[in-house]
Each structure stands twice: as C-alpha cells, then as structure tokens.
C-alpha cells in the first residue's frame, strides 16, 4: 500500500520491489483508483491503468465455493452495497465466505451510499450502477487485455486474529491465493501484503518467490503494533515491539524486506532506520497533495493513493519519470 520499489523477486531477481529503476518511486493505485471509480472493481482498475500506475493495490476475499474475489471487506459493506432489488444494505453482511460467487453477483457495488461520511470522502468518484465484485482472475485478464506487462499487483489478504470466523485460516487463505497467482503466471509481478503478519510468515515459507509486504498502523481506531499493551499484539506473528524496539526492526526480524506503514505514523527517523536495515518503505493511503509532496521529499520508496491522477501530476511537475499509461475498457 505504500511507496514503491517493488520489482519482484523470482529466481534470483532483485527484491527491489519499491525501487523500480525505471521511475524511482512506485505510484500505487489504491483499490484501483478509488477516488475516481467504485473501489476494487474492474472500472476502477481500468481507470488506474489508463492513467498509468506502477502498481495496482487490491484486497481479496474467498467465496463459499472457493472463488477468490476482489473486495476490501470480508463482509459486505453497506456504504457501497445494494441488493438485487436496488436497496441499500442496512447493516454489514452477509459474509462473503457464506455466499457462492453466483450469489455474490446479485449485489451492486457501483455507487457510494449518498449522504454518508464515506461518500463525502470521495466526491469525485463516478457512480457506475450495475458494477459487480470481480474475481481476481478477472483483474489479471483486464491487465493482459491492456497490454501492460510492467504493472505489478499488491494483493492484500484480509485476515484478522480477532475475527477468525470471517475468513479462512491464514495457511489455507494464503495457499489458495498463491496457487491462483502461479496459475495465471503472475508470481514475478505479485506481492502479498497483510496487517496479519502470520499470513506473511506462511507466504515466506511456502512461496518465497513471492514478495511480502508488512503493513502497520498505530492509530486509535486500529493499531496492529500495540506498543502500549504489555501482552503485545496478536497481529504480528509473535514479533513484539517490546522485544525489538521499533517497527522496522520487527519487520526485519520477521524476515521482511518491505515495510508499509500508514503515512501518518511514519517519521523521518523511522524511515532512515528502515533504509539502514535494508528495508524498502511504501506508505498508504496518501490523498492530499501536501502530504504526497512531503512523502516524496522525505524519500519514501512508494506511495499508495486513491487519486493516482493527482500524484502523477505532482510527479510530473517534479520531472519524475512516470509509469506508462495503457488505456483499457473494463
């Protein structure tokens, strides 16, 4: 979700995922281009490809009949979801793992629910009624259709140690996604990211050719590091802040090569420490121009944004080389 030096690391290829020599800083389209089109949908990814990004960031879930789909929420989000009658969901749910893919396709995710805080956050998102939650394989097909052989994928596995009932266990979940990545020939272009570091430990063990990205956030609403808790965090696979002294050192101890913190948590001292440890650092989710400029100034390796068009303009004004645009229709 963050900065970008994500080049892929298969069969001796460099782990420089965020430091792509072609353009230096990865421009990562968050859920495609969430600020412009319905999130995690084919129109959103098509918009990002048409603008030109180095990486497509996306989230995954798995249906009752084992179809890997692209969705941020393990349970359907009432802020973006209407049923087959066009009625907005009144509360979260049902869980995607309780639905077959055919059942899931009855839901429309092409519009933000009006007059909600969520909708107000993305005033320029274009509604596209009738848009459905896609399969991961559909996204791979769209990219192949675009002819873009350089764009990479940051694939988040949505697992929570506090809500194991909402998803498959980390081992099964990771293996199914990895199997599809290999089947589609995308291992060299895919990175798996998660806030639940247990999942990343599984990936490093069973598919070391696929790079991992360690997500972190230390905010009141969500904190997967839990520095203030004597018992530590359930999210970090046993690698605790009290034992290592900093998040970069936790990532390093976990065998990670890429750290992706929430941009508001990152300090210049942490960035320097991470780089000194040999880690790449990509930040998420940066939408305000001033914040994007600051992140570029301090030297992050990649920036994840809902507005790739805005970040591209900032990069262009600085004379930075831009990723190729490959216009495509979903």
Model features per residue range: what roles?
Residues 1-5:
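Positively charged n-region of N-terminal signal peptides that target proteins for export
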Residues 6-9, 34-35:
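General helical structural elements
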Residues 8-19:
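Bacterial N-terminal signal peptides
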Residues 20-330:
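Phosphate-group recognition and catalysis centered on beta-loop-alpha active-site segments
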């Amino acid at each position: 979700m963050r900065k970008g030096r994500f080049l892929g690391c298969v069969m001796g290829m460099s782990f420089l995922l965020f430091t792509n020599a072609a353009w230096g800083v990865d421009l990562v389209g968050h859920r495609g281009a969430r600020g412009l089109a319905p999130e995690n949908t084919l129109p959103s990814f098509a918009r990002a490809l048409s603008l030109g990004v180095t990486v497509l960031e996306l989230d995954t879930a798995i249906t009752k009949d084992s179809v890997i789909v692209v969705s941020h929420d393990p349970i359907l989000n009432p802020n973006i979801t209407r049923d087959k009658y066009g009625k907005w969901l009144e509360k979260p749910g049902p869980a995607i793992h309780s639905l077959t893919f055919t059942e899931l396709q009855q839901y429309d995710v092409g519009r933000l629910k009006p007059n909600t805080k969520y909708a107000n956050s993305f005033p320029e998102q274009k509604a596209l009624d009738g848009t459905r939650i896609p399969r991961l394989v559909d996204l791979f097909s769209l990219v192949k259709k675009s002819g873009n052989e350089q764009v990479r994928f940051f694939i988040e596995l949505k697992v929570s140690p506090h809500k194991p009932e909402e998803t498959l266990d980390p081992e099964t979940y990771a293996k199914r996604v990895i199997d599809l990545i290999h089947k589609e020939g995308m291992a060299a272009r895919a990175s798996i990211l998660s806030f639940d570091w247990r999942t990343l430990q599984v990936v490093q063990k069973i598919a070391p050719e696929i790079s991992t990205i360690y997500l972190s956030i230390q905010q009141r609403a969500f904190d997967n590091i839990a520095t203030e808790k004597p018992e530590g965090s359930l999210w970090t696979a046993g690698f605790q802040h009290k034992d290592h002294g900093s998040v970069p050192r936790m990532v390093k101890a976990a065998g990670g090569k890429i750290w992706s913190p929430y941009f508001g948590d990152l300090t210049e001292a942490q960035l320097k420490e991470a780089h000194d440890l040999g880690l790449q650092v990509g930040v998420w989710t940066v939408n305000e121009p001033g914040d994007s400029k600051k992140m570029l100034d301090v030297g992050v390796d990649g920036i994840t944004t809902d507005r790739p068009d805005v970040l591209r303009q900032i990069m262009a004004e600085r004379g930075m080389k831009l990723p190729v645009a490959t216009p495509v229709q979903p």
